[in-house]
Amino acid sequence: MAALLQCISHSPMKGYVDPSPAIVSDVEVAIARMRKELVDFDPEVIFLFAPDHYNGFFLDVMPQFCVGIAATSVGDYRTTPGPINVPREIARSCAEHLISNDIDVAISYRMQVDHGMVQPLEELMGGLNAYPVVPLFVNGVAPPLISIRRARLFGAAVGEYAKKLNKRCLFIGSGGLSHNPPVPQIDTATEEFAEFLIAGRNPSPERRAARQQRTKDAAIRFAAGDSQLHPINSVWDEAFMADLVNQDWGALDAYRNSEITEQAGISTHEAKSWVAAHAAMNAATSGGYMAEVRYYKAIPEWIVGYGAMAGSAEQAT
């Protein structure tokens, strides 16, 4: 089989609270290079690992992993709303493979996804329906959280399934890197916000707009240095990406959730989507691939350590 790997950060603040034009241009150049590689590769199926931010998954029932048999974008932060082109039989077969191999995934015939999944679709392939996409939710924001090891095993099982398809498969990881946006935790939230975290599906346009405005205000304060949010940790980000480049699965398995939160911020756990994508690539190619860092910069305006990585089996020597 032929396989391609792409991992990229996302931020809802893109286009709302931007860094300097030079930084925006550098990010766009990195994305354009990855977009061209995707188009040239022409994937027959995409496996997209991504988190959610209390737009589709809530604490009434919060799975650690979920395979979307059908999925729709909620259209938050000016992302495109509407159905995603999910190859239903492949998605269902993938879920069956995972469950039969001791990965206890949930499935959804009505998955709702937000910018965490939609931004890479828009930026790398121009929209929701350009290619068949199997959406793979990885819980990255709602404790209790899986370990990096479990994310790796999940991704590896997806990669083993993809290998059997004998198709051109693209593995995308969306999320991270270090960041701690203003998302209340259930234990400290007000009663009203706790109810939202539990059952906040399909909010009114006014309520969604108010929530998004709070995030914009927080980004402005964070960029100005007037914020109590956890700082971006470039040292952590670069060490994490180096472990991925080196395929140092032992080092990655040794990461502890408490240390990730303390060193890099609670939402850094989104980076487990990158681990899953790399593990899928590793399994699909039997380790015969190489990955490289394409871009990294701490971007406070976007409240994130923003990174991009890519890899292909053809690069391996």
Swiss-Prot record:
GO biological process: 3-phenylpropionate catabolic process
Top-level taxon of origin: Bacteria
Keyword Oxidoreductase attributed: yes
InterPro entries tied to this protein: DHPP/DHXA_dioxygenase (IPR023789), Xdiol_dOase_suB (IPR004183)
Pathway(s) of this molecule: Aromatic compound metabolism; 3-phenylpropanoate degradation
SUPFAM superfamilies in UniProt: LigB-like
CDD domains to which the protein is assigned, alphabetical: MhpB_like (cd07365)
One Pfam family, short name: LigB
EC number: 1.13.11.16
Keywords associated with the record: Aromatic hydrocarbons catabolism, Dioxygenase, Iron, Oxidoreductase
Gene Ontology MF terms: 3-carboxyethylcatechol 2,3-dioxygenase activity; ferrous iron binding
Catalytic site: H115, H179
Catalytic activity annotation: 3-(2,3-dihydroxyphenyl)propanoate + O2 = (2Z,4E)-2-hydroxy-6-oxonona-2,4-dienedioate + H(+); (2E)-3-(2,3-dihydroxyphenyl)prop-2-enoate + O2 = (2Z,4E,7E)-2-hydroxy-6-oxonona-2,4,7-trienedioate + H(+)
Cofactor: Fe(2+)
EC class: oxidoreductase
Assembly with partners or alone: Homotetramer.
Role: Catalyzes the non-heme iron(II)-dependent oxidative cleavage of 2,3-dihydroxyphenylpropionic acid and 2,3-dihydroxicinnamic acid into 2-hydroxy-6-ketononadienedioate and 2-hydroxy-6-ketononatrienedioate, respectively.
Protein family: Belongs to the LigB/MhpB extradiol dioxygenase family.
Protein name: 2,3-dihydroxyphenylpropionate/2,3-dihydroxicinnamic acid 1,2-dioxygenase 2
Source organism of this protein record: Dechloromonas aromatica (strain RCB)
